[in-house]
Curated annotation (Swiss-Prot):
Protein name: Proteasome subunit beta type-6-A like protein
Name of a matching Pfam family: Proteasome
Subunit note: The 26S proteasome consists of a 20S proteasome core and two 19S regulatory subunits. The 20S proteasome core is composed of 28 subunits that are arranged in four stacked rings, resulting in a barrel-shaped structure. The two end rings are each formed by seven alpha subunits, and the two central rings are each formed by seven beta subunits. The catalytic chamber with the active sites is on the inside of the barrel.
InterPro entries: Ntn_hydrolases_N (IPR029055), Pept_T1A_subB (IPR000243), Proteasome_bsu_CS (IPR016050), Proteasome_sua/b (IPR001353), Proteasome_suB-type (IPR023333)
SUPFAM superfamilies: N-terminal nucleophile aminohydrolases (Ntn hydrolases) (SSF56235)
GO MF entry, a single one: threonine-type endopeptidase activity
Swiss-Prot/TrEMBL GO biological process terms: immune system process; proteolysis involved in protein catabolic process
Phylogenetic placement of the source organism: Eukaryota, Metazoa, Chordata, Craniata, Vertebrata
Length: 217
C-alpha cells in the first residue's frame, strides 16, 4: 500500500506527533497522541487535542507547526460551513479534504503542517484522506503520519485488514498509538480517538498508563 510520512522538521511549537485514521465496516476512527514540543526536545504541552472537528461527521488531525495547523483548520471550518449552507446539505468528506488541500497548496511556501481528514457521508460512507505538505491529496483506507509513524509502518501494514469491526479497529488504533508513543520522544501524553459513523460521533480518551503494554516496556 502507498504510504505517506508527514514532514517532522518543523520550527516553533510543534505537535510532534503521531496521527492516524483507519476505516472499518461502517465507520472510521481518527486518532492522535497529545504532546506538543519546541525544537523536538522541550515538551511545551502534554494535553494538546490534535483532532479538530470541521463539520458534524468530518474531523482532521494535524502534524507539524501548531500555529500553521490551527490557522489552516480555522479557515477550512469557515469555508466548509459556508459551502454546506450554500448547498443546503452536509458537505462530503472529499469536499472538506479538498478545501484543506487548496489552503495548503496556495500557502505551500509558508506552511509547515500536514493533515489527515476523515469522516462519513451518505455518498461514500467512511473515508480517509491525507493532505500532505504542498497540497497533495491522497485517498487511502488507512493512513499514519507524524514523527511517530516511523516506528509503526510495519505494525500497521501487518495488522490492518479491510472491513474490521469497530472493536477490532479501536484495538488496532490503540496499539499503533501505544507503540509509537513508546518509541518516539516527541509523541506522548494521552491517546485521543474519535469514532465516526452514520449514527454520530464518539470521543475516546485513553490516559498514557492505560494504553496497551508491550513486552519491552
Amino acid at each position: 500500500m502507498e504510504r505517506h510520512l508527514m514532514d517532522s522538521q518543523i520550527k516553533g511549537v510543534s505537535t510532534g506527533t503521531t496521527i492516524l485514521a483507519v476505516t472499518f465496516n461502517g465507520g472510521v476512527i481518527i486518532g492522535s497522541d497529545s504532546r506538543a514540543s519546541i525544537g523536538g526536545s522541550y515538551v511545551s504541552s502534554k494535553t494538546i487535542n490534535k483532532l479538530i472537528q470541521v463539520h458534524d461527521r468530518i474531523f482532521c488531525c494535524i502534524a507539524g507547526s501548531l500555529a500553521d495547523a490551527q490557522a489552516v483548520t480555522k479557515a477550512a471550518k469557515f469555508q466548509i460551513s459556508f459551502h454546506s449552507i450554500q448547498m443546503e446539505s452536509p458537505p462530503l468528506v472529499k469536499a472538506a479534504a479538498s478545501v484543506l488541500k487548496e489552503l495548503c497548496y496556495n500557502n505551500k511556501e509558508e506552511l509547515q503542517a500536514g493533515f489527515i481528514t476523515a469522516g462519513w457521508d451518505r455518498k461514500k460512507g467512511p473515508q480517509v484522506y491525507t493532505v500532505a505538505l504542498g497540497g497533495m491529496l491522497l485517498s487511502q483506507p488507512f493512513t499514519i503520519g507524524g514523527s511517530g509513524s516511523t516506528y509503526i509502518y510495519g505494525y500497521a501494514d501487518a495488522k490492518y485488514k479491510p472491513d474490521m469491526s469497530k472493536e477490532e479497529c479501536l484495538q488496532f488504533a490503540k496499539n499503533a498509538l501505544a507503540l509509537a508513543m513508546g518509541r518516539d520522544n516527541v509523541s506522548g501524553g494521552v491517546a485521543h480517538l474519535v469514532v465516526i459513523t452514520e449514527e454520530g460521533v464518539e470521543h475516546v480518551v485513553i490516559p498514557g498508563d492505560k494504553l496497551p503494554k508491550f513486552h519491552d516496556e
